[in-house]
Amino acid sequence: MLDFAQLPPEVNSALMYAGPGSGPMLAAAAAWEALAAELQTTASTYDALITGLADGPWQGSSAASMVAAATPQVAWLRSTAGQAEQAGSQAVAAASAYEAAFFATVPPPEIAANRALLMALLATNFLGQNTAAIAATEAQYAEMWAQDAAAMYGYAGASAAATQLSPFNPAAQTINPAGLASQAASVGQAVSGAANAQALTDIPKALFGLSGIFTNEPPWLTDLGKALGLTGHTWSSDGSGLIVGGVLGDFVQGVTGSAELDASVAMDTFGKWVSPARLMVTQFKDYFGLAHDLPKWASEGAKAAGEAAKALPAAVPAIPSAGLSGVAGAVGQAASVGGLKVPAVWTATTPAASPAVLAASNGLGAAAAAEGSTHAFGGMPLMGSGAGRAFNNFAAPRYGFKPTVIAQPPAGG
């Protein structure tokens, strides 16, 4: 602390009048008071919400934990609001102390006038006629000195009292201190994962760089490398595989079905070679079984054919020669029934059948008998209705019997 009594009034007055005044201090006081009001409102709202939840629908251990964690925060808000209000009050007190010291300080122009008057009196004091005036001027200057020193001492004391503030306490910790360590571990894992991802990115780039082995080689060597599929590789559109060209690409496509080398190469090779090979082995086993049973089947077939050949001479005399001769004698002598050619024996042994008999045998009325036939044989009677045949049980018409006929096709008109 300065000893203001040792300083002339010119210095003390200059110090008081040179500052920005009480404006900044009053603005700080208003800010502290606004902060105190905001903290009080927040604490009241927070307390009302917690009380409403705890006394209302939210019950149980989780509600109790919430109340236990939130209550210290509400208390801290109220305490901090009180401290902010006190800081605002102290700032107002400091501003008031400054105003009081400012009004108690001698204005610098008055001090300058006193000094100028003294200099003039001294300059014109030839015969000592200005001695009394000089003493009065010096006494006035001493009063100014004492007045400024008292004002500065009072202002220093008031300012020291205004700066006596209670320290602000931090809010109670409600987080888990171990969370920082866990977060650091997570960050480490993320960095490691990024390094692995970078390695996975660098490896394909390095492999892709191998495709430029023959970049600075002679043209004939470059063409040979492309023909063999050692260069000219390109990545697929989605970057999942390497498309191989040249002879190597043809070989890869023949083995896997595609010229692209990716994660599915193993499965494609299995599906193209291993699975068909297993199917071929299964078929070979079936063919082997057939080849094993074929001699036995051939032996049984030959034995059956030999027995049939031995029985043929005994079966020949049983063939009715009359039937054969009749058939042989009728060759080239077909009879006509309507527009069709039929064997002659049909017309010689089969009498004409009346429409009424046909209608009765078919279960139809007279109208149906008069209606024209629509089947292929027209009005020709069935073979079973003729006389002198071997099938005598069909010689007479059978009532209620419905014969099966072939319908006339559309192509027949």
Swiss-Prot record:
Disruption phenotype: Knockdown of this gene in cells with simultaneous deletion of PPE25/PE18/PPE26/PPE27/PE19 genes result in a severely impaired growth in phosphate-limiting media.
Residues spanning the signal sequence: none
InterPro entries assigned to the protein according to its UniProt record, in alphabetical order: PPE_C (IPR022171), PPE_dom (IPR000030), PPE_sf (IPR038332)
Top-level division of the source organism's lineage: Bacteria
GO terms of biological process kind: phosphate ion transmembrane transport; response to host immune response
A Pfam short name: PPE
Family under the similarity heading: Belongs to the mycobacterial PPE family.
Protein name: Uncharacterized PPE family protein PPE65
Source species of the chain: Mycobacterium tuberculosis (strain ATCC 25618 / H37Rv)
